[in-house]
Amino acid sequence: MRHGKVHRKLNRTAEHRKAMFANMCAALIKHEQIVTTLPKAKELRPIVEKLVTLGKKGGLDKRRQAISEMRDLDQVRKLFGVLAPRYKDRNGGYTRIIKAGFRYGDNAPMAVIEFVDRDEDAKGKDSGPTQESEAA
């Protein structure tokens, strides 16, 4: 019986799910908008909302909790330095999910998950490694 089982398995092991959502959290914080499948977006939303709430609370212990959840120091800095002040007056509801049709190939339902009041210039900026960062 599935009583009390609230999360989707997404056909992955627990370690794979944890790593996938850590990467997706970092990507969403970096670009402030990502396209993924609808079930993944629905599972990602509460994780990101809790991270933004950690950022709003501030403090070293909350920063360490965010680092252990996300494992990307640059995005944790952005979370605490940019996103937390942006949403300081908002009580939850930091993200929205917009259905985006179906994927060609397997007809999977797609969705766009983005931050409410997001920075339009953040999308696509600094995607992937650059030669300056590899040389340094």
From Swiss-Prot:
Record keywords, A-Z: Ribonucleoprotein, Ribosomal protein
GO cellular-component term (any): cytosolic large ribosomal subunit
Organism the protein comes from: Rhodopseudomonas palustris (strain BisB5)
Subunit structure of this chain's protein: Part of the 50S ribosomal subunit. Contacts protein L32.
Gene assigned in the entry: rplQ
Family statement: Belongs to the bacterial ribosomal protein bL17 family.
Cleaved signal peptide residues: none
InterPro entries referenced in this protein's UniProt entry, alphabetically: Ribosomal_bL17, Ribosomal_bL17_CS, Ribosomal_bL17_sf
Taxonomic superkingdom: Bacteria
Protein's name according to its UniProt entry: Large ribosomal subunit protein bL17
Gene3D superfamilies: Ribosomal protein L17
Pfam families: Ribosomal_L17
A biological process term (GO) from this entry: translation
GO molecular function annotation: structural constituent of ribosome
